[in-house]
Amino acid sequence: MIEGLLGRKLGMTQIFDDEGRAIPVTVLEVGPCVVTQVKTSDRDGYQAVQLGFGHRKRQNRPMQGHLRASGASPRYLKEVRVDDATRFQVGQVIDCTIFQPGQLVDVIGWRKGRGFQGGVKRHGFAGGPKTHGQSDRHRAPGSIGPTTDPGRVHKGKRMAGRMGPVRVTVQNLRVERVDPQRNLVLVRGAVPGHPNGLVIVRYAVKQRRAKATA
């Protein structure tokens, strides 16, 4: 069994359930993914498959040789662990039908890069007073540490810095709809990243459990 696929984020919209309630969903184009390499325990020491997604017009010579057996020219490659690698063949296509409406998935994306930002935008600081003689401290972080002892700024202090495109995992998103004809998966809620950004959709690792009732 394969646990996840590559895809891209298309954007957000809303759908309506049977009772007419609006549900915010993110539309993901998941797959089709081509198996470009199969790794087995005998040869590689572990079992996994390498998946390719998207299309790249030109590949360099080493990549052309690597992809020749699969007949594909993907833009992205990702290795995914599997239980039994012998069930997969190079060139096999896997689509979004491995996901079903109602199940929970984890979506991995890369948050938008916003460059160097101050404490108000980066950490949600309140800033300084807007009145009482303040003129240049409206968005200042305030004090960043104690006095002579210890005489330094502690590690991990929240300060201004780069809000870079870091990897973010959103867990336990419910699959609302699956459209195999267009390779679309609609998940409830928001997903990190910009439109057309790469995402990884996998089965939920930490399944939510219902609270026990007395």
From Swiss-Prot:
- Please give the start and end residues of each transmembrane region: none
List the GO cellular component terms: cytosolic large ribosomal subunit
Write the record's keywords in alphabetical order, separated by commas. Answer: Ribonucleoprotein, Ribosomal protein, RNA-binding, rRNA-binding
Out of the domains of life, which is the source? Bacteria
Molecular function GO labels: rRNA binding; structural constituent of ribosome
Example GO biological process: translation
Q: Where is this region: Disordered?
A: 119-159
Q: What NCBIfam families does the database record attribute to this sequence?
A: L3_bact
The job of this chain, per UniProt, is described as: One of the primary rRNA binding proteins, it binds directly near the 3'-end of the 23S rRNA, where it nucleates assembly of the 50S subunit.
Record note on quaternary structure:
Part of the 50S ribosomal subunit. Forms a cluster with proteins L14 and L19.
Regarding protein family, the annotation reads: Belongs to the universal ribosomal protein uL3 family.
Q: What is this protein called?
A: Large ribosomal subunit protein uL3
The lineage is: Bacteria, Pseudomonadati, Thermomicrobiota, Thermomicrobia, Thermomicrobiales
Q: Which gene encodes it?
A: rplC
